[in-house]
């Protein structure tokens, strides 16, 4: 915990609340003192949605400090269960209330079967699912907590479904389909990215199975294993869940962000590789009960089964299938090259006055790991702009970031201290700054 003038990534409970408020019919209860309850105001101001932010603060005051928190927290959980009837109630402390060192899991267990709020004897069992966000508020930031909370919610409902249907193997959709993981509230242009991702998948003949968590329902999380693969556009949130689904259900995932022409092509080729490995054919229907495909089996599946041709209804993209064998997807000639040469506006923009003014000029990039790495490569490879410094505030993902941007910039900066970023910008005097709101202030 530290006192800061500016924070690139907020405290852990903000990430938990962002995930909870992204789902439909999910309510979050924040066990916190006054002063930590600014999330409602922040989200209402930035998102401009019609519905109220589904977050209730269980305030830690002098009465709580004197008597303990259990009675008040349990009362708030059961009250919201009766008033809102949500599918899920998520309880989270803040870094401040964590100082009390209370076992909130006991409160969750008590709320599931608790005494009536009115003091009458008897049992008043909450109809909603109640979970405690399992996050260390002293060791992780907002993005790490969001990723962990999303994985925890998905794990909770998939294990719940597994207990109800112990002998049932999830069946895949008839047509190739994907889950888009990581679109959530207060994300940087997440809605625009989601629209473009859906358009991209549709052009490739791939259906969208579920979009999690933004606008999704926790009751639909049981449908996640029905998709053929998972698409994770941002490393900051969704990667843990994709790894969990791969481990438990052998679902492959694509974690390449389609930013820029080159990386978009790389992402599409990775999707093509996955679809070909899965043989496009209801590959799991002939497996014995409870059997999971290994990577070796996936890679050798097409040779073993001679890859029967795909039904006509699957051929949404003209030329997606190899014309000779009619067995595998081939997006290279009919989609990637066509988009790159004739559809993309990159060639036009590279000759525009805006881009020419920046050619051979110096630029500084700073942001989260996904966007900073993507923008750095776009500027260096596709626009001919010299990136003198590229940086990120995601210190937990520093190794991946350095691996991505090495060779595309002169210096690499990994820090969450805005003063270091300001000093670097003042020293380099770039012609353009690509960064967060703080870098905008620094540039002025």
Curated annotation (Swiss-Prot):
Keywords, ordered alphabetically: 4Fe-4S, ATP-binding, Chlorophyll biosynthesis, Chloroplast, Iron, Iron-sulfur, Metal-binding, Nucleotide-binding, Oxidoreductase, Photosynthesis, Plastid
Functional pathway: Porphyrin-containing compound metabolism; chlorophyll biosynthesis (light-independent)
Ligand binding ([4Fe-4S] cluster): 36
The protein's name in its UniProt record: Light-independent protochlorophyllide reductase subunit B
Catalytic activity: chlorophyllide a + oxidized 2[4Fe-4S]-[ferredoxin] + 2 ADP + 2 phosphate = protochlorophyllide a + reduced 2[4Fe-4S]-[ferredoxin] + 2 ATP + 2 H2O
SUPFAM superfamilies hit by this protein: Helical backbone' metal receptor
Cofactor annotation: [4Fe-4S] cluster
Keyword Ribosomal protein belongs to the record: no
EC numbers, comma separated: 1.3.7.7
Enzyme class: oxidoreductase
One Gene Ontology MF term: metal ion binding
A GO cellular-component term linked to this record: chloroplast
GO biological process: light-independent chlorophyll biosynthetic process; photosynthesis
Subunit structure: Protochlorophyllide reductase is composed of three subunits; ChlL, ChlN and ChlB. Forms a heterotetramer of two ChlB and two ChlN subunits.
Cofactor: binding comment: Binds 1 [4Fe-4S] cluster per heterodimer. The cluster is bound at the heterodimer interface by residues from both subunits.
Top-rank taxon: Eukaryota
Signal peptide range in chain numbering: none
Active site residues of this protein: 354
Compartmental location: Plastid, Chloroplast
The family this protein is said to belong to: Belongs to the ChlB/BchB/BchZ family.
Function: Component of the dark-operative protochlorophyllide reductase (DPOR) that uses Mg-ATP and reduced ferredoxin to reduce ring D of protochlorophyllide (Pchlide) to form chlorophyllide a (Chlide). This reaction is light-independent. The NB-protein (ChlN-ChlB) is the catalytic component of the complex.
Gene: chlB
Main location: plastid
């Amino acid at each position: 915990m530290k006192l800061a003038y500016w924070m690139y990534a907020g405290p852990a409970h903000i990430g938990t609340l962002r995930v909870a408020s992204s789902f439909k019919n999910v309510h979050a209860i924040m066990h916190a003192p006054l002063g930590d309850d600014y999330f409602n105001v922040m989200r209402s101001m930035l998102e401009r949605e019609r519905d109220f932010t589904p977050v209730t603060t269980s305030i830690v005051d002098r009465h709580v400090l004197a008597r303990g928190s259990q009675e008040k927290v349990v009362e708030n959980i059961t009250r919201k269960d009766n008033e809102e009837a949500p599918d899920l109630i998520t309880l989270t402390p803040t870094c401040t209330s964590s100082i009390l060192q209370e076992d909130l899991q006991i409160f969750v267990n008590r709320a599931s079967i608790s005494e009536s709020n009115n003091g009458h004897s008897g049992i008043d069992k909450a109809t909603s699912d109640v979970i405690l966000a399992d996050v260390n508020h002293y060791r992780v930031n907002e993005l790490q907590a969001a990723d962990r909370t999303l994985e925890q919610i998905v794990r909770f409902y998939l294990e719940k479904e597994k207990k109800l249907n112990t002998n049932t193997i999830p069946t895949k959709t008839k047509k190739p389909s994907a889950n888009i993981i990581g679109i959530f509230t207060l994300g940087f242009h997440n809605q625009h990215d989601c629209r473009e991702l859906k358009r991209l998948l549709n052009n490739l003949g791939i259906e969208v199975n579920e979009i999690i968590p933004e606008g999704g329902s926790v009751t639909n999380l049981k449908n996640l294993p029905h998709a053929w693969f998972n698409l994770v556009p941002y490393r900051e949130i969704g990667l843990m869940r994709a790894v969990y689904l791969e481990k438990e259900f052998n679902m492959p995932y694509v974690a390449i962000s389609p930013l820029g022409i080159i990386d978009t092509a790389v992402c599409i080729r990775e999707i093509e590789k996955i679809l070909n490995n899965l043989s496009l054919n209801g590959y799991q229907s002939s497996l014995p009960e409870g059997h999971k495909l290994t990577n070796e089996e996936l890679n050798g599946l097409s040779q073993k089964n001679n890859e029967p041709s795909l039904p006509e209804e699957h051929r949404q993209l003209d030329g997606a299938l190899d014309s000779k064998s009619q067995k595998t997807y081939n997006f290279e000639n009919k989609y990637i090259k066509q988009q790159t040469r004739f559809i993309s506006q990159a060639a036009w923009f590279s000759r525009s006055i805006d881009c020419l003014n920046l050619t051979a000029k110096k630029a500084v990039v700073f942001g989260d790991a996904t966007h900073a790495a993507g923008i750095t490569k776009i500027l260096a490879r596709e626009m001919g702009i010299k990136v003198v410094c590229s940086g990120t505030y995601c210190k937990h993902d520093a190794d991946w970031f350095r691996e991505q941007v090495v060779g595309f910039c002169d210096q690499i900066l990994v820090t969450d201290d805005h003063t270091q970023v300001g000093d670097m910008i003042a020293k380099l005097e770039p012609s353009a700054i690509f960064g967060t709101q703080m870098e905008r202030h620094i540039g002025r």
